[in-house]
From Swiss-Prot:
Residues 1-18 form the signal peptide. GO terms for molecular function: lipid binding. Keywords: Glycoprotein, Secreted, Signal. It is found in: Secreted. InterPro entries: Bactericidal_perm-incr_a/b_dom, BPI/LBP/Plunc, Lipid-bd_serum_glycop_C. This is UPF0522 protein C. It comes from Dictyostelium discoideum. Pfam families: LBP_BPI_CETP_C.
Length: 503
């Protein structure tokens, strides 16, 4: 029984916090196709059935009323079919099988005392057979919540649906004295179903803690910068698709999808913005591959802001500029002599420190996705030019960036990067104490540096760790990027590779 419960839990973890057909704004949607889930359900059912039927059940000793009993040599044969799952409400769902048949056989011995002083023991022994006479169904009601940093899972009830006369209880006594056969039969008949239901519920709740770590609230993106680590906020909900009439509907894991920074002090810094776009229902539900991963602008917006959080403020000193650079941080450098002549006149031949400051929260990164690619808008990035510890002028940079996304497969998931197609810069003067500033020089400088821009890579970990991804493709829709692929159990894949090598 315990093994049966543990295996059930493994599938329960993939079906959390359902709310049929209602999708929240998120950064990442991971959709599993109905056909894949049906195949998975069949394989899962066969695995459970084999495990149950081969599981050695320990002997049971106990006492009921005046009868002490011993149940030995327990054998079971269970057949499961029509695996299903369904959303029943916010954070609640049912999982089970619409077809359950079984046969259980045991040997038993029951002993009781008789006589005036109860000193004479009478023992009866024989065998018990419990079997289904009709098709039963098993339904497990779960409450699972992964919306917070600490997930919770619990089983509220287990129901074995039995039609009238659906189970036959047969106790056969092989002793010469068989006074308690009728009592034993009635006892089993009255307690079998309730004990199965309560036992499964208890075992599930006793073991759910082992599986909470399979759905972490933060997933490591294997990215580090400037002593900071990057994580994907994977809190969210699983939504049952709007399609009806199937036992295993397409399921969509809607994750927050924001990029969280863990700084060198161990503090976690979450995005200041929230998801604000929602793909169409068709985008996350209607696909032919096993899995679809849909990325929205929020993921990329929070990534850029996370990079700002990690890198800024940043100060560049004259000694950090390479000797071969076309511009040097000195007030008498030709570049500054042309763009800020008042600076050269007021502070001749003086070193310049450049301080780049993170944009204010009111100047959030804006990302848009359409058929041409990914458009990134970075607004009002302040850059201070400092001479003798005094800010002599400030420049505000606004960037419009066009990217073409590119897809690659990593060892632990999917990696998305991009190629820079276009970088437009709008430069304005924030403040100055050295007269006019010719901002066109800074625009030209940005154009020269365009080839040095590196686009960070986003890695989305494969949420199904026992499956590998194949046949990956990328497409762009209205405010989303979608990655399609198929899933294969790693053990099966290894067997196929071995067969190819043998041939």
């Amino acid at each position: 029984m315990k093994l049966f419960i543990l295996i059930i839990l493994s599938i329960c973890l993939a079906l959390v916090n359902s709310q049929q057909g209602v999708y929240p704004d998120s950064g990442v949607y991971v959709s599993l196709n109905s056909n894949f889930l049906a195949t998975f359900g069949n394989e899962f059912t066969q695995t459970i059935q084999n495990q149950i039927n081969s599981y050695p059940v320990a002997n049971v000793d106990g006492k009921t009323g005046k009868v002490s009993y011993s149940v030995t040599n327990i054998q079971q044969s269970v057949q499961l079919g029509d695996f299903f799952f369904q959303q029943t409400g916010v954070n609640t769902y049912n999982i089970g099988w619409n077809s359950v048949t079984f046969t259980i056989t045991t040997d038993y011995q029951g002993c009781y005392k008789i006589g005036g002083l109860k000193k004479l023991s009478i023992c009866e022994k024989g065998d018990i057979k419990i079997n289904s006479q009709a098709t039963l169904s098993l339904s497990i009601a779960m409450t699972i919540d992964f919306t917070q940093s600490t997930p919770t899972i619990s089983c509220s009830s287990t129901t074995l649906n039995v039609p009238a006369n659906g189970i036959n209880y047969n106790v056969h006594c092989s002793s010469k004295v068989c006074d308690k056969t009728h009592d034993i039969t009635n006892e089993i008949a009255s307690k079998f179903v309730p004990s199965v239901e309560s036992g499964m519920t208890t075992e599930i709740n006793n073991n759910v803690g082992k599986y909470l770590s399979l759905f972490p609230s933060l997933r490591d993106m294997n990215m580090e910068y400037n002593g900071n680590e990057f994580y994907l906020d994977s809190r969210g909900t699983i939504v049952e698709s709007s399609q009806g009439g199937v036992l295993t509907p397409t399921m969509v894991l809607a994750m927050n999808g924001g990029i969280v920074v863990k700084n060198s002090a161990g503090q976690f810094i979450y995005p200041t913005q929230s998801p604000s776009s929602l793909p169409s229902e068709e985008a996350v539900e209607d696909f032919q591959t096993d899995i679809a991963v849909t990325l929205t602008p929020y993921l990329f917006e929070s990534l850029v802001d996370a990079m700002f959080e990690s890198a800024l403020p940043m100060t560049i000193t004259p000694s950090e500029v390479p000797s071969e650079s076309p511009v040097h941080l000195n007030t008498s450098d030709p570049f500054f002599n042309q763009t800020a002549p008042g600076l050269t006149g007021k502070y001749p031949n003086s070193p310049i420190d450049v301080e780049i400051i993170s944009p204010s929260s009111s100047s959030q990164t804006m990302v848009s996705i359409n058929s041409t690619g990914v458009l990134v808008g970075l607004h009002s990035i302040p850059v201070n030019f400092i001479v003798n510890d005094e800010t002599v002028f400030q420049i505000l940079f606004n960037f419009n960036i066009e990217l073409t996304p590119a897809l690659s497969q990593s060892s632990n998931g999917i990696s998305v990067t991009g190629t820079l197609d276009k970088l437009d810069a709008l430069v304005t003067v924030g403040s100055t104490s050295v007269g006019d500033i010719d901002v066109s020089g800074f625009v030209q400088l940005i154009e020269l540096a365009q080839g040095l821009v590196k686009i960070p890579t986003i890695t989305i970990q494969n949420p199904l760790t026992t499956y590998s991804l194949s046949d990956l493709s990328l497409s762009i829709g209205d405010q989303y990027i979608q990655i399609l692929g198929n899933l294969q159990q790693q053990q099966q894949q290894q067997q196929k590779q071995k067969q190819i090598l043998i041939k």
